[in-house]
């Protein structure tokens, strides 16, 4: 299995608040991305914490005797644990009070794609077409779901970056879990630092036209 990963501060921020982890094991291959928020490096702290906590939780609790539904529940509990730890850390450290982060994970296990997410960092599945697996927890996505605006209007909405769910924002969190068949597609996980500037079809083109996923990630 081939992996590629990169994080870049870009031209619009002074601090890179994104973090990621890739687990390249044959048994439980997965990747997680996080996009922090909170200012004064608090977002960077939150995204780093969520990635580390999820990694540690999964390392301790994933087992090959689990079926894919049970593995999904282990992932959910990893997110819930991370949320609680980040929330309490922020509450007790005034310099990072109010910090939070998105978190999106995708794992391939037993020929299934298991995804978990909170916030608006996305997971895509790329085969002949590109398909967004996750559904943004954002203000504009709620407007789209209610039919009040179109997906095209959402791209330029003044509140397009307002998220409605974040890790560490409250003492509890609802984690969306999805399980889909895996048929050899390429999975892409990314923060809005990519999707705010690159169209879905462009992402697909970069991925499909490159044999090396690391080069694809770096060019995107």
Q: Which residues does each predicted region cover?
A:
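PP2C/PPM-type serine/threonine phosphatase catalytic domain
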Residues: 1-220
């Amino acid at each position: 299995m081939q992996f590629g990963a990169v994080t870049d501060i870009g031209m619009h921020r002074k601090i890179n608040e994104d973090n990621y982890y890739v687990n390249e094991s044959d048994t439980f291959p997965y990747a997680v991305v996080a996009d922090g928020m909170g200012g004064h490096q608090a977002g960077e702290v939150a995204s780093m914490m969520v990635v580390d906590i999820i990694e540690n939780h999964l390392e301790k609790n994933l087992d090959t005797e689990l079926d894919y539904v049970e593995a999904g529940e282990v992932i959910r509990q990893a997110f819930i644990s991370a949320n609680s730890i980040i929330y309490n850390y922020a509450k007790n450290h005034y310099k990072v009070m109010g910090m939070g982060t998105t978190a999106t994970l995708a794992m391939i296990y037993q020929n299934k794609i298991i995804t978990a997410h909170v916030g608006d960092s996305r997971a895509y599945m790329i085969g002949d077409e590109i398909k967004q697996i996750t559904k943004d927890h954002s203000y504009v996505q709620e407007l789209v779901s209610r039919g009040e605006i179109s997906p095209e209007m959402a791209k330029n909405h003044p509140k397009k970056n307002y998220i409605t769910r974040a890790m560490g924002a409250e003492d509890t969190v609802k984690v969306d879990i999805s399980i889909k068949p895996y048929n050899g597609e390429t999975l892409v996980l990314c923060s809005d630092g990519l999707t705010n500037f690159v169209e879905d079809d462009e992402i697909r083109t970069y991925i499909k036209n490159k044999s090396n996923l690391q080069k694809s990630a770096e060019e995107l």
